[in-house]
A protein has these predicted regions:
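Active-site SXXK
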Residues: 121-145, 158, 286
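Short glycine/serine- and small hydrophobic-enriched flexible loop segments
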Residues: 134-142, 215-222, 310-318
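Active-site-proximal beta-strand/loop segments in catalytic clefts of secreted hydrolases
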Residues: 103-105, 158-162, 170-174, 196-198, ...
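Mid-domain, small-residue-enriched loop/turn segments at the edges of structured enzyme/sensor domains
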Residues: 169-225
Length: 321
């Protein structure tokens, strides 16, 4: 009996000592932890939560911007694909050589397309007159020639009525073809486009590349070579031209507007037009040049031009929505 009581007391003592030791250990750990604890008042907590919210808002904004950027990129890819399909469909109707270029000048879209079945320059017809006008104002600003009322009137007639006599007088004032070709070289850096003879005269064809026509439209929209005032004069002369109702601008929807300079020589199968078109907050340039194998019959090419202007404009409009 005594042995049993001893064992009982001994066992309880062990339990007590173990509990006591654990208590001491726990107290030490708690004190050590407490020395590292930072206590915050309400003001500190407000700052912490404010910083936390700020970081989360910044992360959310970054995620949103990235998502928006991807969405815009997808929209832009879709627009480029749609315009590419339009060009392919319309130019498949043309029996001959062609070049087509489209480029965003202003707005959220990013279109810069060039379709062609020939790398050779094409006869320019009257589209060369845009370059003659730019050259005239460049030389006026340089002081090489004087801006007389007669010259200003001829530049306007050259662009608005496509008057060949007025054009040839402007060429004479400039001193000949080389002056215009120097301006073209400054604009484009290449020799794809060139003035080789007076308008409606015999001789070597005046030549153009639609990429250069787009560059000319860029110069009118955001002038670098000539002043904004003179660029505006050219654009005003390209408003309500005598071909507005027959080519790229003919079937423009009511929500769009544009200016243009066309060229044609139906008895040689030549049909061309270049335009700047506004739709919503978008402004784009569109240039088409064709030299067909059907002389004296340009009805099909005129229809292609009208369709192209209308359908490409509608594509940009859908992008805007």
């Amino acid at each position: 009996m005594m042995e049993k009581n001893y064992w009982y007391r001994s066992n309880n003592l062990k339990k007590y000592l173990l509990a006591f030791a654990l208590s001491i250990l726990a107290t030490g750990i708690a004190r050590s932890y407490a020395s590292d604890v930072v206590y915050y008042d309400d003001y500190d907590l407000d700052i912490i939560f404010e910083e936390y919210d700020k970081e989360n808002v910044e992360d959310l904004n970054e995620d949103t911007e990235e998502a928006d950027s991807l969405e815009e990129e997808e929209k832009n890819d879709k627009l480029n694909e749609e315009i590419s399909n339009i060009i392919s469909e319309e130019m498949d109707k043309v029996d001959g050589s062609y070049q087509v270029a489209v480029k965003t000048l202003e707005g959220d879209s990013d279109v810069d397309l060039d379709f062609r079945n020939t790398s050779e320059s094409l006869p320019s017809a009257s589209t060369i007159k845009v370059f003659i006008a730019i050259s005239a104002y460049e030389n006026i600003e340089r002081g090489s020639i004087n801006e007389t009322d007669s010259l200003s009137n001829d530049i306007h007639l050259m662009l608005n009525r496509s008057d060949n006599y007025a054009t040839n007088r402007v060429i004479d004032v400039l001193g000949g073809f080389s002056t215009v070709n120097k301006t073209i070289a400054k604009l484009t850096g290449l020799n794809r486009t060139s003035l080789n003879r007076k308008l409606a005269h015999s001789g070597k064809e005046n030549m153009v590349d639609v990429s250069d026509l787009i560059i000319a439209m860029e110069e009118l929209n955001d002038p670098k070579l000539i002043s904004a005032i003179n660029a505006e004069k050219i654009k005003q002369a390209m408003t309500n031209t005598n071909t507005k109702s027959s080519k790229l601008l003919a079937n423009l929807p009511s929500y769009a507007s544009g200016i243009n300079k066309s060229g044609e020589n139906p008895d040689r199968g030549q049909e061309l037009d270049v335009a700047i078109i506004d739709v919503g907050s978008t402004r784009f340039a569109l240039a088409v040049a064709m030299k067909t194998n059907k002389y004296y019959d340009n009805a099909n090419e005129l229809k292609v031009l009208r369709n192209m202007g209308e359908r490409v404009t509608e594509a940009f409009y859908r992008f805007e929505k």
